[in-house]
Design a protein with these regions (language model features):
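Alpha-amylase-like alpha-glycosidases and glucanotransferases acting on alpha-linked glucans and related
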Residues: 137-139, 146, 225-226, 238-346, ...
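C-terminal beta-strand-rich structural cap/linker in extracellular carbohydrate-active enzymes
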Residues: 80-81, 461-486
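Carbohydrate-binding surface patches
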Residues: 32-35, 42-44, 403-440, 480-483
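C-terminal accessory region downstream of the catalytic core in glycan-modifying enzymes
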Residues: 384-385, 437-462
Length: 486
């Protein structure tokens, strides 16, 4: 992102310059002075302008051989909370640059950087202080929500994360999710030079006052054995610059180390797959235990991700011919069952489990639960999570699975997960016709999950054996999970 602010960056020595960017660039208090540093190798001249000098060109910055411009102010010249920018000249033209490494931006216009003197705990000290040494890398069922989507706050910058934890933690535990994925954390501002809205990747929405609040949110989640992921992505306009790679590596480490975040969920590949591959490798090199997953994408593992986590409605499109709300609820339940047991992970967007997607800036929609179908589906989502996580047979087959096969036949989707100690078969009715199917494999089978039975819709599934052959009968849009016992 910021490497492209001034001209083309081809041929620069980005990695050696920018590694350690957050600790070096931006506004940092060092002894009796506050140093301001920005990377702009092709600039002709750079000035530090801000509320401390009337936004005038009185603080000329000096450039080193690496392309980093620097100036320093005494502690009496700049105060905590002062706004500032970099005024950069190139070919006689000036542009104003918001500091890419600032931890806060102007709350009124989201445009000026704000100087803050903040000291973070290291990841080790964070864990030690909060007694948080649990491993949250095993991601199974994730609940995704926006920070301004659960509390009825009119201003998203005023989110109280401790109150948010009080509201959402009991619900997440009740529903059986293993992780939360938070979106909408980053401040945004309008970049007039590029005529678009830009994320401030180091700035938490709400500024410095919310940093301790977010750390407490993570602590409360960890105490309840819930992992914390954040929605994270590199700017879509980049793709390949070495300085950009180092910058976003540092940004990922900033969130992982300073806030106790357990992992990153990357939903956009628009900055380029090769750039993402290098980025994931770079972060993993610094933090081997960092969990980085893609929100979708079959090639995520090839890019170095720790797999992907599909949205719970991702399989809904394979179901055909739904004509009623009851059929849609049954199809949603089957889609979620099929996805979770086939992929091993699932991401539920807030509101999906109650039959209604969450509106940005709106609190949790309890009215959605006023309908019987939506209430049934919410109960089903909880039962699905707990069945997948707590059933010993499912857990062993999930953990030791050495092959997964998928096929569609006669309007059915059949998923097999085979392991040395057993086999799971997931069968879903895609066409809503219902009917009876023969399980060709010999042996004895046990039905351990029946979607329509949990929903209380249709006749549920029936497993029967005749003359050594096992038959499964499903009602319309039903799904069942079978465990081979012998």
């Amino acid at each position: 992102m910021y490497a492209q602010q001034i001209g083309d960056m081809e041929g620069t020595e980005g990695p050696s310059i920018i590694t350690g960017a957050y600790s070096g660039l931006g506004a940092r208090k060092e002894g009796a002075f506050v140093f301001f540093r920005v990377y702009a190798p092709y600039a002709d001249e750079v000035f530090l302008v801000g509320s401390f000098n009337g936004w005038g060109e009185t603080h000329r910055m000096k450039k080193d051989r690496a392309g980093v411009w620097e100036t320093s102010l005494g502690k009496k010249e700049v105060s905590d909370g002062d706004g500032y920018k970099y005024k950069i000249y190139k070919n006689g033209q000036a542009v104003y640059l918001t500091d890419p490494c600032s931890v806060e931006t102007d709350g009124e216009h989201y445009h000026n950087s704000v100087y803050r003197n903040i000291e973070f705990l290291s990841r080790e000290k964070f864990n030690e202080k909060n007694n948080s040494e649990k491993d949250f890398s095993l991601i199974k069922s994730v609940y995704k929500f926006r920070v301004d989507g659960w509390l009825p706050a009119t201003n998203s910058r005023q989110v109280d994360y401790e109150r948010l934890a009080d509201e959402i933690l009991p619900y997440v535990l009740q529903m059986g999710y293993t992780h939360v994925d938070i979106s909408g954390l980053f401040e945004e501002y309008y970049d007039f030079t590029e005529n678009r809205s830009v994320r401030a990747p180091f700035a938490l929405k709400g500024g410095r006052e919310k940093i301790a609040s977010l750390c407490n949110f993570v602590r409360l989640m960890h105490k309840a054995s819930i992992g914390v992921l954040i929605d994270w992505c590199a700017d879509e306009s980049i793709g390949g610059y070495d300085a950009d790679l180092a910058f976003y590596t540092e940004n990922a480490l900033y969130w992982l180390d300073n806030f106790g975040i357990d992992g990153l969920v990357i939903g956009s590949f628009e900055c380029g797959t090769e750039f993402l591959r290098q980025l994931v490798h770079s972060v993993k090199r610094e933090r081997k235990n960092a969990c980085i997953i893609a929100e979708s994408g079959e090639d995520a593992t090839m890019l170095g991700f720790d797999g992907c986590v599909e949205r719970s409605d991702g399989y809904l499109g394979i179901f055909k011919g739904m004509d009623s709300p009851e059929e849609e609820i049954c199809a949603k339940a089957s889609a979620a069952t099929c996805l979770l047991f086939e992929k091993g992970r699932m991401l539920t967007e807030a509101g999906f489990e109650t039959g209604r997607e969450q509106d940005v800036g709106s609190p949790f929609d309890y009215e959605a639960l006023s309908t019987v179908n939506n209430m049934r589906f919410q109960v089903f989502c909880s039962e699905l999570n707990y069945a997948y996580l707590s059933d010993a047979d499912i857990g062993e087959c999930r953990k030791n699975a050495n092959s997964v096969s998928v096929c569609e036949r006669d309007g059915m989707r059949i998923v097999r997960r085979q392991a040395e100690d057993g086999e799971l078969v997931i069968i879903c009715d895609l066409l809503g016709k219902g009917g009876e199917w023969r399980i060709n494999d010999g042996g004895e089978w046990q039905m351990i999950f029946d979607s329509n039975a949990i929903l209380g819709m249709g006749d549920g599934a029936l497993l029967k054996s005749e003359c050594g052959t096992t038959y499964l009968r499903l009602s319309a849009y039903g799904s069942a999970v079978l465990k081979k016992t012998i």
